[in-house]
């Protein structure tokens, strides 16, 4: 029997599901009555991991966000992975807003998460390893406590628990 157990904490986004969600949002946009005769659009830049929303006015921008977030939810992609930037004026009075798709734990977020695990007083070790955090313990129960603790927190990124050993 192993004397140490571990798992990894990651924050990854399935880009295929994001692509599917954006395509479904485009289809809904084309069929919605309130968007008839509108130049509103949703564009995905896979290379830069950015989604660009263009709308006629504030109301339609809010509706575009609702459509996109609804499709993300249906495809089981966390809305927490979207980081909306500031709205800006586009051509001919239109409004443009960019949403960056966040994938991976930055070093700041990893340190913050590691500190949260240490502050929980559960007897585990948290090691930052690039874009993931490895949590090690001698008891499986402690690892399960850490997972339960992190799930009940409202962390600003979607967290997945992988590589159980």
Curated annotation (Swiss-Prot):
Keywords on record: Nucleotide-binding
Family annotation (InterPro entries): DUF520, UPF0234-like_C, UPF0234_N, YajQ-like_sf
MF annotations from Gene Ontology: nucleotide binding
Any one Gene Ontology cellular component term annotated for this protein: cytosol
Classification via Pfam families: DUF520 (PF04461)
Function statement: Nucleotide-binding protein.
Protein family per UniProt: Belongs to the YajQ family.
Name of protein: Nucleotide-binding protein TGRD_519
């Amino acid at each position: 029997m192993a004397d140490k157990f571990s798992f990894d904490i990651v924050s990854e986004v399935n880009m295929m599901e994001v692509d599917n969600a954006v395509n479904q949002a485009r289809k809904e946009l084309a069929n919605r009555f309130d968007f008839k005769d509108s130049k509103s659009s949703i564009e995905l830049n896979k290379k830069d991991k950015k989604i660009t929303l263009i709308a006629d006015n504030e109301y339609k921008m809010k509706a575009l966000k609702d459509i996109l977030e609804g499709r993300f939810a249906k495809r089981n992609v966390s809305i927490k992975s979207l980081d909306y930037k500031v709205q800006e004026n586009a051509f001919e009075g239109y409004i443009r807003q960019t949403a960056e798709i966040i994938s991976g734990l930055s070093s700041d977020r990893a340190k913050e998460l590691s500190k949260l695990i240490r502050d929980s007083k559960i007897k585990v070790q948290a090691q930052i390893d690039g874009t993931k955090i490895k949590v090690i313990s001698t008891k499986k129960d402690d690892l399960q406590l850490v997972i339960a603790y992190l799930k009940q927190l409202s962390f600003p990124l979607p967290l997945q628990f992988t590589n159980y050993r």
